[in-house]
Amino acid sequence: MPKERIVAPSKEFAKLANVSLKEYKSKYKESIEKPEKFWAEQAKRLTWFKKWTKVLRHDFAKAKVEWFVGGKLNVSYNCLDRHLDSPLKNKAALIWEGDNPDESKVLTYHDLHREVNHFANVLKKFKVKKGDRVLIYLPMVPELAIATLACTRIGAVHSVVFGGFSPEALLGRIEDCKPTLVITADGGYRGGKPIELKKNVDAALAETKFKVNDVIVVKRTGDEGNLNWKEGRDHWYHYLMKDPEVKKECPAVPMESEDPLFILYTSGSTGKPKGVLHTTAGYLLGANLTFATIFDYKDTDTYWCTADIGWITGHSYILYGPLSNGATSLMFEGVPSYPDMGRFWDVIDKYKVTVFYTAPTAIRALMREGLEHIKKRSLASLRLLGSVGEPINPEAWEWYYANIGKSKCPIVDTWWQTETGSIMISGIPGAIPQKPGSASWPFYGIQPVLVDNEGVELKGKGEISGNLCIAKPWPSMMRGVYGDPKRFFDTYFSQFKGYYFTGDGANRDKEGYFRITGRVDDVLNVSGHRIGSAEVESALVEHKSVAEAAVVGFPHDIKGQGIYAYVTVKQGVVTNDLLKKELIAMVEKVIGKIARPDVIHWAPGLPKTRSGKIMRRILRKIANNEFDTLGDISTLADPSVVQSLIDDKKKYHS
């Protein structure tokens, strides 16, 4: 494969595209030079109850940002009500495809509006009011979308927790955000197997110091025999929705632009997950504009983002981006491998999906299966592909382009974060020529800069690598870490003064294309999901046999990054496969299966400085078989540990 292949948009695609290269350059220039004028114009895309008095007020050095000051609007109104006086009323808003291929459901905008209004009044019955937190721990079922939108309708702050997280992970989130109530399901399905949800909620609530008085339970599996039902606390969703005393109509509450919208927890470089706080107007505008522009949205599209709503990708590009544009968004409960490895392609053909947005991890897993399943399907409806969650390697990009897009669909390789709220760097289909493996150019209003380790901006027109920062505020950026302003400032604004620090490294070539090179902190990107090394280490040392643990990432064929755990056991403990299984089970219990280590390397000791700091740089190199580039290890407290780890790596983990 040529080192730097450039794929220009086809004339056919470019002719119908929403944005041309000339228009992109003009709009981008205005968005950087006259940001307030640009964003005031874009804000007309939303419906406001009251117009703002000031577009932007900020002190970036102090992490203070406010957009559309004085304005009032409602997210639910923008996603539902404003579409009802048009033909969109009877258009499919959500297409739900169950884990079982025989289960599906379509909700029009009228249907979704009705259900959201009704459930918003159920929430009000439980005294949920503006500013209260509601924790949602549901599978990918329509009730998840209904619950989030109902929260936004009455001004409650939702916090969706991915259904794969353990009771202990759930407990930490409950104690941090202190929800008025919890919404869960009796269970769920994943790959044909039932998964426990209410049981996990019960376990978390049994341990919490914060009392949750009410739990609303969606009936999904119907396995009532195994439910630990708590009268007075637990309430069936379907009974509540049939309650004749609950009104059907619920007015959308006018919200200030900067009112909190949702909290979404993400891993940090320290053990405790961060509650990323997003606010109303800026977030919605970011999701709305990026969806319409980057996915070249047409009103005839059937759009499918394969993410879970438990992650930011699902928030922005299953719910808020598509629905605020009046799009048809597909919501998928299942996995790409069930009932066989052709499931994604079946769903695309079944619903004539036109825009498909998935993760490199899924692409690599499907790539490994060969072309057998693809040849049995048409995929002719597709016109645009997307990639999200981690950098896509050029080999996977080429496979995706040739075999799924049939060499005619552009690929938007999108870089962004939970914290950024919406896509930051991406190709614009039909406008920007693509380079496999590159996230391309910045979106409107985004001013990325590369800085060295001292915070000095790296300028020049040649190829440059450095720490990726953002120089100016943008509407959809997070406004804080919930309940912890110091952590917000320390994490994102203290390391490089005057910049938002992404935690990623990047390379910029002479044409201005960005390639994301990965995390530069102690956060792992596993299958597109962020996992803090400290979280996994803390889980491992909970085991009575473990004295110490250090976790690093290593290249993984499918996941992008795998989890490599160095474990030192206590004196007298015998290391064996049974203990490895116990440690993996411990991590699954504390965090969830998503964080299970791929490799457990028994370590006689860990390389430390004389002050006791673990040298993770050395551990990463050993995990990556880079034994010849360790650098000077003579200053370590015990340099002999390094050779011992290398010998074991060659012997047991090669």
Curated annotation (Swiss-Prot):
Coiled coil: none annotated. Keywords: Acetylation, ATP-binding, Ligase, Magnesium, Metal-binding, Nucleotide-binding. Its EC number is 6.2.1.1. Mg(2+) binds at residues 541, 543, 546. Disulfide bonds: none annotated. Acetylated. Deacetylation by the SIR2-homolog deacetylase activates the enzyme. One of its GO terms (biological process) is acetyl-CoA biosynthetic process from acetate. The keyword Ribosomal protein does not apply. InterPro entries: Ac_CoA_lig, ACAS_N, AMP-bd_C, AMP-bd_C_sf, AMP-binding_CS, AMP-dep_synth/lig_dom, ANL_N_sf. The keyword Coiled coil does not apply. GO terms for cellular component: cytosol. It catalyses: acetate + ATP + CoA = acetyl-CoA + AMP + diphosphate. GO terms for molecular function: acetate-CoA ligase activity; AMP binding; ATP binding; metal ion binding. The modification N6-acetyllysine is found at residue 613. Its cofactor is Mg(2+). ATP binds at residues 389-391, 413-418, 504, 519, 530. CoA binds at residues 190-193, 313, 527. Belongs to the ATP-dependent AMP-binding enzyme family. Catalyzes the conversion of acetate into acetyl-CoA (AcCoA), an essential intermediate at the junction of anabolic and catabolic pathways. AcsA undergoes a two-step reaction. In the first half reaction, AcsA combines acetate with ATP to form acetyl-adenylate (AcAMP) intermediate. In the second half reaction, it can then transfer the acetyl group from AcAMP to the sulfhydryl group of CoA, forming the product AcCoA. This is Acetyl-coenzyme A synthetase. It comes from Leptospira biflexa serovar Patoc (strain Patoc 1 / ATCC 23582 / Paris). The gene is acsA.
